[in-house]
C-alpha cells in the first residue's frame, strides 16, 4: 500500500494508491478532526495480533466509513455501500463504481500507514 500525506487549508490530507483509496477517505473523514481516536485502533491491532491464529473480529463504526478487523486483515468500507442499489436502473454498459468505497490491507501495512500519519502530523503540522 502506497500513501502520501500533504497539508491543505483544512489540515493534513491523506492519499492512497488505487485499491486502497478507502483507507485515505476513512482517515480524512474519521480521524483528522480527532487524532486521539487512533489510540483505541492501535490497541485493537495488538488484540488482533494476540488472538492469532484464532479467529477474531472487531468493528470501529464511523460517521462515513467503518473499519473491520480480523486477526490479519483490515477492511475500510463506506457506510453507505450497503444501501440498496438497483442494477436495473443503470443504463446498459454502465456499472457501479465502488473502488473508493471499500479497501483491504494486511494488519501490518495498516499499522505502518497509521504510524506514518502520526509521524507526519507530529513533524509537519
UniProtKB/Swiss-Prot annotation:
Record-annotated disulphide pairs: none
What Pfam family does this protein match (any one)?
A: UPF0231
Q: Which NCBIfam families match?
A: PRK05248.1-2
Family indicated by similarity? Belongs to the UPF0231 family.
- What protein name applies here? UPF0231 protein in hemN 3'region
Gene source species? Mannheimia haemolytica
Its ancestry begins with: Bacteria, Pseudomonadati, Pseudomonadota, Gammaproteobacteria, Pasteurellales
Amino acid at each position: 500500500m502506497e500513501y502520501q500525506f500533504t497539508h491543505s487549508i483544512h489540515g493534513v490530507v491523506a492519499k492512497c494508491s488505487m485499491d486502497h483509496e478507502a483507507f485515505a477517505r476513512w482517515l480524512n473523514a474519521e480521524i483528522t478532526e480527532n487524532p486521539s481516536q487512533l489510540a483505541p485502533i492501535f490497541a485493537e491491532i495488538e488484540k488482533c495480533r494476540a488472538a492469532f491464529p484464532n479467529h477474531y473480529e472487531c468493528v470501529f463504526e464511523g460517521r462515513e466509513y467503518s473499519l473491520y478487523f480480523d486477526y490479519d486483515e483490515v477492511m475500510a468500507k463506506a457506510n453507505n455501500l450497503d444501501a440498496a442499489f438497483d442494477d436495473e436502473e443503470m443504463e446498459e454498459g454502465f456499472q457501479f463504481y465502488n473502488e473508493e468505497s471499500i479497501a483491504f490491507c494486511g494488519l501490518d501495512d495498516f499499522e505502518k500507514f497509521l504510524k506514518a500519519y502520526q509521524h507526519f502530523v507530529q513533524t509537519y503540522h
